[in-house]
Amino acid sequence: SELDKEALRRGTSIYYPGKVIPMLPEILSNDLCSLREGVDRYTLSVKMHIGYDGEISEYDLCESVICSKHRMTYDDVNRILEHDEYLLDKYSDIKQMIFDGYNLSRVIDKKRKQSGGINFESNEAVIVLNKDKVVDIKPRIQSKSEQMIEDFMIEANRVVAGHMFYLDLPMIYRNHDYPKADRIADFVKTVEDMDYHFRGNIYELESYVLNNCLKSFEGSVEYPLVSSLLLRCMAKAVYETGCTGHYGLGLKEYCHFTSPIRRYPDLQIHRIIKENLHGK
C-alpha cells in the first residue's frame, strides 16, 4: 500500500525537542494503534514466567487483546516508587504491580549484566523548552521508571529473537559486533594508565570483561571519561537477516520487536510473527 511505502521510506519516527515526525500518520500512531486508558487494543504479547534468578521457565508469544487500566507518565511512576502518598492512593489498584515490576526489572538487569551486558553512562542531553524557545540544556539522567521499561523491552526483544532463531524462521536481527581492534587497543592503553590492567588477548575481550572494567571505576571522577571512551570503541549495531548476537547487551540473539508504531523493522517483524502464528 502507499501507506506502507511511506512508512518504509521514513523508516522511523524522528523526535525533535517539542516535536515528532511520526513514521505512521498520527491517526494511527497517536490513536488507533496507541494504548489508551480503558480501550481494548489488539496486540502481540510475550508472556513470560521469570524466576527470582532471572531465568525464564516458560513463555508464550501470542496475539492478544489488552485494556490499559491507566495512562501513566514516567514522572508519576517515579513518584509512586518514591512512596508519594497522593499517587499511592490515586493508583492504589496498581501500586503493588508497579513495585513488583521494578523489583523484577532489577533481577532482569542483574542477569543481563552477568551475561556481559555493558552498562554505559548516558551522555545524552535534554533540551528544555518554554513556548518553543530553548531555556536550558541538562544532562539526561535515566529514571527508575525508564530503567524498568527498558529492561522489559530488552527482555521481550531477546525472547522474540531467540524464538524465531530456534524455529529457523525468516527474521530481521539487531546485531552488534565486537569492538574494532585499533579502538579497543587505544582504550586499554588509556585505562592501564589509570592503573587498571587486563589479562589475556585484548583483541578478544568478552563484553563482561569490559563491563567489569567499567564497574571498577563507578563512583570515581574518571568514570564518565572511561564510560565515554568505551562507548566510542563500540561498533555500530546493524539490521541483518542472519544472527550474530549483540555484543553490547551480551546476548546471543536480539531484535527490535517492541516499537512497531515508530520503527519499520519492528513492524516487519510483527508481520513475520503473525504469518507464522497463522500457519502461512
What are these regions (language model features)?
Residues 1-280:
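Electropositive polyanion-binding surfaces
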